């Protein structure tokens, strides 16, 4: 009967997990899960009472440990199967997340995966630190009664101050619990790690933290709370501190060389030199050099450079910085609102008709006031200035009666022949019209002849008759002389 109760108690205790605050052992251990069956609850209560009695008396503890070891030896894989598959107890799924069952609820529901509970973590012998010389509790070995699960005598799972994480077969150095109802406590450590089946139930009131529990499952409540102190180094949203600003001292635009920061940084250095505007053209800065005196900030009380030149360079744009802004700008002058917003009262046709009638009336009034001008001959400026009357066209009036049969016709050239230079002296009308050779005739030939322009007493002198006689005849009744050949 005691064996069956121990078996049922070990089953119910295998469903519970220990909730320890940390690996230092601060705080008491938690109570196991309450089971839904009445018989396991009574067995668990009996086991708890037996564990309390074992803490006060070493002999009772040894007997209780022997009974539990005998019960576990008959049914060893039960805790492993209970922990490897999800719980089918409806009372465990329906309980609120409070008290000792909080770890079990988290393991099966809240974390979103099926946990595999490990009772002993397999460690690599090469990377694991040697804990044999450490006086503290070493995983896998301790100095106390343990719950062994072996099929024969001489096979213990280790030793500890409480129930160890024993389902790992190993070779003990002392007599271990056998399959019989009674056996002594063995002192030894398992030398062969086996498959883990989960942490064993700890019923001692002052028991230490089980070394076989992984660090992630020791305190799930504390592990689920984010540690902002450790995350602050890796959080991308936390603003990082920027290095302090340093004042850059830059020389003239044409100067070369790298800038070296000053050694003294305690006092604020105000740069009064001209700040360059670029480094592209080092030797073509005539315009910048010409305006260097305008770029200098007088003192720090005037503010920064951008604040000092917020209205532009002093003297370039305006000489009166405090003068108000003009109300009229180029934009406003270009887009003035229309003066007369109303439509005109008359159209273009009416205005054009009125203009046409006005021109017609003006022409009529001028025609009435001014008389009509007569047509006049074309008169040049010279004729108008000298007022010379033109000769009338037509034949002159005859002075004497003429005989057109006997008289030589009087023409325009005969009348104007004496006026022409180089013409022979015409004394009478019968004198032939020839070239005057009086001045070129030799002297012997001209002896006895009349001199040029000498008057002759011929009856038919020029001016007395108006025509010449017919050739071969005489003129008049008196004798006359013939024209010499």
From Swiss-Prot:
Swiss-Prot/TrEMBL keywords: Cell cycle, Cell projection, Cilium, Cytoplasm, Cytoplasmic vesicle, Cytoskeleton, Differentiation, Fertilization, Flagellum, Nucleus, Spermatogenesis
* Region annotated Mn 1, chain positions: 327-340
Q: Where in the cell is it found?
A: Cytoplasm; Nucleus; Cytoplasmic vesicle, Secretory vesicle, Acrosome; Cytoplasm, Cytoskeleton, Microtubule organizing center
Give the span(s) annotated as Mn 2. Answer: 379-393
Q: Which GO terms describe its biological process?
A: cell differentiation; flagellated sperm motility; positive regulation of transcription by RNA polymerase II; single fertilization; spermatogenesis
Query: Per its database record, what is this protein's job?
Result: Microtubule inner protein (MIP) part of the dynein-decorated doublet microtubules (DMTs) in cilia axoneme, which is required for motile cilia beating. Plays a role in spermatogenesis by enhancing the binding of CREM isoform tau to its coactivator FHL5 and increasing the FHL5-regulated transcriptional activation of CREM isoform tau. Involved in the acrosome reaction and in binding of sperm to the zona pellucida. Plays a role in regulation of the cell cycle by controlling progression through the G2/M phase, possibly by delaying the activation of CDK1 which is required for entry into mitosis.
Oligomeric state and partners? Microtubule inner protein component of sperm flagellar doublet microtubules. Interacts with FHL5 (via second LIM domain). Interacts with RANBP9.
Gly residues compositional bias, start-end: 151-191
Q: What does the similarity note say?
A: Belongs to the SPAG8 family.
Name of the gene: SPAG8
- One Pfam family in the UniProt entry: CFAP143
Per its record, how is this protein called by name?
Sperm-associated antigen 8
**GO terms of molecular function:** microtubule binding
Where would you say this protein principally sits, based on its record?
cytoplasm
The annotated regions of Low complexity compositional bias extend over: 132-150
Location of the region described as Disordered in the Swiss-Prot/TrEMBL record: 1-42, 75-98, 127-215
Entry superkingdom: Eukaryota
Give Gene Ontology CC terms.
acrosomal vesicle; axonemal A tubule inner sheath; axonemal microtubule; cilium; cytoplasm; cytosol; male germ cell nucleus; membrane
Report where it is expressed, by tissue: Expressed in testis (germ cells), but not in liver, kidney, prostate and small intestine. Expressed in airway epithelial cells.
